[in-house]
Amino acid sequence: MKSGTIDRRLLTILLVVFVQMLGASLIFPVLPLYAQRQFNMSAEMITLLTSAFFAAQFLSGPFVGRLSDNYGRVPVLIISQIGTVISFILLAFAPSLGWLFFARILDGITGGNIIVAQAYITDITPREKRTESLGYIFAAFGLGFIFGPALGGILAAAYGPTVPFLVAAVAAAAVVLLTWYALDETLSAEERLRARARRAGSLTVGSLLGGAPWALPLLMILLIAFLGQFALGLLQSTFALFGEAVLFQGESQQVTDVGIGLLLSVVGVSQLFTQTFLLRRLARRFDEGQLVVIGSALRTIGMTIYALVTTPWLGAFGSLFFAVGFGIASPPLQSMSTSLVSDQDRGSVLGMFQSSVNLSTIISTAIAGVLFARGPTVPYWIGAATSLVVVMAIISLKRWMPTQPVRTSEA
């Protein structure tokens, strides 16, 4: 495949991810406070709302990954994004608490966008370039996160809390059109047919327990992904509440909405810097395991800063360290997982990886409200501790990783 073709496909899928993330991040600073102010939801119920989304995504993640292997990346990406459009519209017009939960569950069930985007990138990228290329997804995330949360906070403050949901729905609809008209399918009809024929023997959770030589390293990677995500789940489900209770205590709703959005934009700027500049340079100097250690250590520092500070200016440093650490650690960990399986199983293993992440987020977001009720900084101390555990776990993993891929692509 010509490099020019790869570059064009890569740019197109990254544009899709950017627009998608722009829309999704619009609601990030708004939804918890919207639920609290409009529906009188407690912190425990608000974090359960977040948990419901990830529970649905956890159940559908491997299935979506296999669907993309069997029927192509583009059709699955389009269908999943249509579900997101519908869910955002439902959020804007939800008449009751039950409709809020239904909308988030629907988005979770159809929310296989990122799994498919990751599989798409691994399709068009040589093994030795996957850490860098997967990093570009997080760069697109970061770019979307620069504008999305700030714009969401501004729209909510200026026009009301439902407007960000409608704008997010428009952005998601734009992704559907962009995918339909601009994105090329990476799997040929023959490859999709072979994938369907191999379903009975395809990569599943059961195969991880069957004693295959690659099972232990992959299980350890999934466990590390679980632990690494735990801190993020605690943060993302409580950050708006934390901002209102601690960082912007005593400020008006408008100042709080805009301020939380701007702090989340710091996360986006940090992610963009990490993926477009920092990670590529670090990847030339350190191996994938070392990158995960470095990133997890920075994540620990970021969560500790959140637990200690009481002003938004100092909170920005927590956002900086956490986002840079997350950006350094995540792409190489995903790359390590795909290096263990055959080319035909990449979609499936990325689905498993995402399900491990989502399972962690289900648990962390479900208990985050209870922890927050005990004290607004408690979730951040717990997040710092789990990030530190990842550092030790990845050091142990390096002893079990093969020096070359365990499963090779079939000729």
Description of each model-found segment:
Residues 30-43, 238-258:
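Short amphipathic helix-loop junctions that connect adjacent transmembrane helices
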